[in-house]
Regions:
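Short, hinge-like loop/turn segments at secondary-structure boundaries
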Residues: 28-32, 65, 84-85, 114-116, ...
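Glycine-enriched alpha-helix->loop->beta-strand junction motifs that scaffold or abut catalytic
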Residues: 8, 40-44, 59-67, 90-95, ...
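N-terminal active-site wall of soluble small-molecule enzyme domains
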Residues: 1-41
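Short, acidic/polar
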Residues: 27-37, 76-87
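C-terminal alpha-helical cap/extension of soluble enzyme domains
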Residues: 106, 110-181
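Active-site-adjacent beta->alpha loops and helix N-cap segments on the catalytic face
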Residues: 1-7, 49-63, 76-79, 103-117, ...
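Short beta-strand/loop segments at the ligand-binding rim of alpha/beta enzyme cores
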Residues: 6-22, 61-71, 120-126
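Catalytic beta/alpha-barrel core
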Residues: 14, 35-37, 41-55, 66-77, ...
Length: 181
């Protein structure tokens, strides 16, 4: 966190258990403490799993939080995405994030449409994992997401690109609906 703050970059902190694609093996109490320490060190926002005790603790503290849900196996249907979004929004986060796994490019486009349909009050972050989802990672901000996710180094999720690749190769900050078609 301190490294990104010293470089003038915004920072999002996430610490996940293995069942959610991470490597953290500690308790939810430990995770809540680490999240709080990250905020105190300068993290702008925390990304936690929907329904987790750590997410509930951070919301109770009125900490800046993104509530997220990942599906490492499949793409959710349109109605399922809407239902999950409604249930997540009720929790009162700063933003919600849904990231299913795409097996087709059409499914990646479905995620971009989901982002575009966001209510004004709670921003949506949405893209798809997997090789077929990579394009949605690049285009999600074009369709209204406040941020996208990239790695500093090796990918930590299927289809994830490095920050260097997003900025230099794909020039993600220059994309708009005219340049992305």
């Amino acid at each position: 966190v301190e490294s990104t703050v010293s470089k003038g970059l915004g920072s999002l902190f996430t610490l996940r258990h293995p069942e959610h694609g991470g490597k953290f093996l500690g308790s939810e109490i430990e995770r809540s403490e680490i999240n709080q320490n990250a905020l105190e060190a300068g993290a702008d926002i925390i990304d936690l799993e929907w329904g987790s005790d750590a997410a509930a603790a951070m919301i109770e503290k009125e900490a800046p939080i993104i509530i997220s849900h990942h599906d490492f196996e499949r793409m959710s249907g349109v109605l399922e995405l809407k239902r999950m979004a409604s249930e997540m929004e009720v929790c009162g986060p700063n933003a919600i994030k849904l990231v299913p796994t795409a097996s087709t490019l059409k499914q990646s486009v479905q995620m971009l449409k989901w982002v575009e349909e966001a209510a004004d009050e709670i921003p949506r972050i949405g893209f798809a994992m997997g090789l077929k989802g990579t394009c949605s990672r690049l285009l999600t901000m074009v369709y209204g997401a406040p941020i996208t996710y990239a790695s500093f180094g090796d990918a930590v999720a299927p289809g994830q690109l490095s920050m260097d690749s997003m900025m230099k190769q794909f020039r993600v900050t220059e994309l708009n609906k005219e340049t992305s078609c």
